[in-house]
Amino acid sequence: MATIMFGSIAAEIPVIKEAIMIAMPKSKHTLHVVQVEAKHMATEIRSERGKLYVAKRFADNAIKAYDSQLKAFDELLKKNSDLQKRLFIGQNSPIKQKKGGACFVRSLSFKQAEERHAKYLKLQEEEHQFLSGAYGDKAYVGSVQGTLDRKVAEKVSFKSPYYKRTCKAVRQVKVLKKAVGSGKVLDQVLEIVAETGVPVTFVGKGANKTLRAQYVRRYGLVIPKIFLCHESGRKVHREMSYWHHKETLQYLCKHGKYGALNENALCKGDSGLLFDQRTAFVKRVTYLPHFIVRGRQEGQLVCATEYLDNVYTIEHYTHKPEEQFFKGWKQVFDKMAPHTFEHDCTIDYNNEQCGELAATICQTLFPVRKLSCNKCRHRIKDLSWEEFKQFILAHLGCCAKLWEEQKNLPGLEKIHSFVVQATSENMIFETSMEIVRLTQNYTSTHMLQIQDINKALMKGSSATQEDLKKASEQLLAMTRWWKNHMTLTNEDALKTFRNKRSSKALINPSLLCDNQLDRNGNFVWGERGRHSKRFFENFFEEVVPSEGYKKYVIRNNPNGFRKLAIDSLIVPMDLARARIALQGESIKREDLTLACVSKQDGNFVYPCCCVTQDDGRPFYSELKSPTKRHLVVGTSGDPKYIDLPATDSDRMYIAKEGYCYLNIFLAMLVNVNEDEAKDFTKMVRDVVVPKLGTWPSMMDVATAVYIMTVFHPETRSAELPRILVDHASQTMHVIDSFGSLSVGYHVLKAGTVNQLIQFASNDLEGEMKHYRVGGDAEQRMRCERALISSIFKPKKMMQILENDPYTLVLGLVSPTVLIHMFRMKHFEKGVELWINKDQSVVKIFLLLEHLTRKIAMNDVLLEQLEMISQQAGRLHEIICDCPKNIHSYRAVKDFLEVKMEAALTNKELANNGFFDINESLGHVSEKNLCKSLREGMARAKLVGKIFCNMAIEKVLKGYGRAFDKESCRRQKRIFKKICECVLHECPNTPRKCTYYNFK
């Protein structure tokens, strides 16, 4: 059998039956060929390297295919310009980080991306040139791109940007409250009581279980004291039960401070003292652990817890009667002490004198024989009020001699007077009985009121508050009745005054003529609209809706403001908000007074009065809704809306502040003939408005309207815009198309130009014709400033004397102002100017001149001010008879009225001993006015000195030609004499002249 060797291992090979002979070329032997089976062959194991190679080739082919696809995709994308543009922007956009740590790409515009890319390329080029050594050894303009600091040994942390330290959890330790027993609380309370000495009460269950105690300092010790029954006058066999209060007594003794004490030392006043066995004598006198002092019986100490048969044999150790009395008196006396402390009290009287004073007051108000007697007290209690007063009066009469002795004590006389006055009766019965006789058997209301007042007066000091209240009410009712029936004033006329608004609208023919209306029924302005530009361009300002309406809401005037409803042009579509827009803002509503009416020849001029309701109350204005481009006219009935001239159809106009009265002239333009519209508008612009200016009075406006109606009579029937009257600021508001958000004003009755002209009459009596847009206080201050600034300006003062002479009356604010006006001879010029015009105005100047002469003779400011106050009444009487159509009439009249009332009030204050604060205010005001005068004088002197220097220079120039220039002494004397005559001063050197040099 054949074998095969595998190393050292031999493997047999079986012989195959069918042998195949194989001839070898060089071998003579015949070889047997055997058949090799599969089981004899080794298993084929493929190489791992080949597997990897196959996988690698597959992957390479896949990557090549993917790259080829990407390359083809890139070629396709490069052809898309929009996508390349977005890619370019994304490559050059910066990366930002949010607060939370998240990153995002901030997208740029294409232009910004190009700039950023160009900057990047430039930096790359500079870096390449720098690395290649292209830069030479010299300075270059630029900035360092990196940090110059060298970092040395520094700590490197491995914390990521997202690291956040976890806070250590706070361990909550639950604190358990310690339970405190009642014994601990009681110890703390008693510790405080022992320190302060305040009394403490132990409340027990049942009768006689309450215990009152207090810590007292006796014999240098702190000992608890129990309040016993016999201290209040009640004597019992056993004062208290020991076994009921044993625990309480232990706590009381626990906080007491005991020491060595002899039992014989105990005496009166020691009743209720509590001792325990720490005190030596306790064991000898009682078998109990505690001893409460009650008193002594046959020389032996008695405990309050012991039962005794005969309580009357015990000597109780209560306080002495005088000590008890003083203790009670002291407690109430300190509680009723006055609460005001104006000084530190001292001991100026001994105890005996103090006792006499206390007894005197006590027996005066509460006369008894013994204060401790219950019958004496009940006797006073049972007396009626009248009997008690009689009893007090009788007692005072019996003790009159003693009162005479005690009157020397300070303050006691006032007490005596008070008691006598409080108990005295009204002894003057004759007058009271006469009143009763006259009013007897009369049942009218006024007679009954007089009887009630008489009854209260008859009672005198015994009248109660109810009696006085009833008498005061009856007196008030009588006063009102008398006021309503007075005939000395015209106040009663207002009770029946009615000025109702007409229910029918006025008819304006110009608005009804078909020739002046278009096919829509609107008024056609024609030439009037073209010429109306003279109004809108000069005295109106354009309202730009795009800028909002807020700045036009507040309509200011010198003494207040009014709110327009222009903001309501923005209409909300919400129904609730739209209803809110219909509500106005009310001002303080004024009642009907004499200021609301105007009279002529004693009769009411109704168009010049305020409108009233049916019951006589004033008619208050309501919300006036705004419109965009209209002229609103008509004071009665529904308003009429006239379109503004259509020259600028898309523009809105509002009158400038101070020129709202131009709406009246614009309404008159409706009735002006077209061929006369140019003359009308030019006359208003060039003549009327310069005369009226801003904030004119209603009287001036009516006069200007009258002048225009003379040239254009057809305007008399023109309807007026609604005019609201503000009595608080003495202002009249002419309402335009923007309405009024402020409500509560009075309404003027005048509806046409013809009715408005009545305000121009001098015979018209009433305040409203002097109303203007502006207040009295502001107007007065303006007049004062104008007066002070004009004292040293003759031309300006002449204008004031001609146009507004009442302004000089305001010089009463300061004696210095009056003296300067007197020295400048302004009063004399006023007399010369008005002597042929109005004698009543001349009286004012003469009185002011006479007053100034008296003031100049006195140097004391307070006396000068008193002289001025005394003449205020006389000036007020004169000015009431003067013409009332002058600008400052109202302000000056009110100023004089204030002066008069202040003088009367100060007189009453001085009579009653009060201090007048206006004295110090007068000094301050005088200083301020003198400062203003000095400033004005300095300006005037400067101008005067310039002219004087020019004159002196000319004189010296002439003297220089006549005399030798070398004679300096003579020239100096000449210069000095001229300065004395012209400048009222004597200079040492002629420094004011620069023409000649005298050095």
UniProtKB/Swiss-Prot annotation:
> EC annotation?
3.4.21.-, 3.4.22.45
Keywords from UniProt, A to Z, are:
Host cell junction, Host-virus interaction, Hydrolase, Inhibition of host innate immune response by virus, Protease, Serine protease, Suppressor of RNA silencing, Transport, Viral immunoevasion, Viral movement protein
Q: Where is this site: Cleavage?
A: 317-318, 774-775
The cross-references to InterPro entries, in alphabetical order and at most eight, read: HC-pro, HC_PRO_CPD_dom, HC_PRO_CPD_sf, Pept_S30_P1_potyvir, Potyvirid-P3
UniProt GO BP: proteolysis; symbiont-mediated suppression of host innate immune response; transport of virus in host, cell to cell; viral translational frameshifting
Instruction: Please verify whether the record's keywords include Hydrolase.
Output: yes
Key word Ribonucleoprotein present in the record? no
Q: Where is the Peptidase C6 domain?
A: 652-774
Q: Name one GO molecular function term.
A: cysteine-type endopeptidase activity
The residue ranges of the Peptidase S30 domain are 176-317
What processing steps or modifications follow its translation?
Answer: Potyviral RNA is expressed as two polyproteins which undergo post-translational proteolytic processing. Genome polyprotein is processed by NIa-pro, P1 and HC-pro proteinases resulting in the production of at least ten individual proteins. P3N-PIPO is cleaved by P1 and HC-pro proteinases resulting in the production of three individual proteins. The P1 proteinase and the HC-pro cleave only their respective C-termini autocatalytically.
Motif Involved in virions binding and aphid transmission: chain residues: 626-628
Q: Which residues form the active site?
A: 230 (for p1 proteinase activity), 239 (for p1 proteinase activity), 271 (for p1 proteinase activity), 660 (for helper component proteinase activity), 733 (for helper component proteinase activity)
Q: Where is this motif: Involved in interaction with stylet and aphid transmission?
A: 370-373
Q: Which GO terms describe its cellular component?
A: host cell plasmodesma
What remark about domains does the record contain? The N-terminus of helper component proteinase is involved in interaction with stylets. The central part is involved in interaction with virions and the C-terminus is involved in cell-to cell movement of the virus.
Please give the family membership noted in the entry.
Belongs to the potyviridae P3N-PIPO polyprotein family.
Q: What is this protein called?
A: P3N-PIPO polyprotein
Organism this protein belongs to:
Bean common mosaic necrosis virus (strain NL-3)
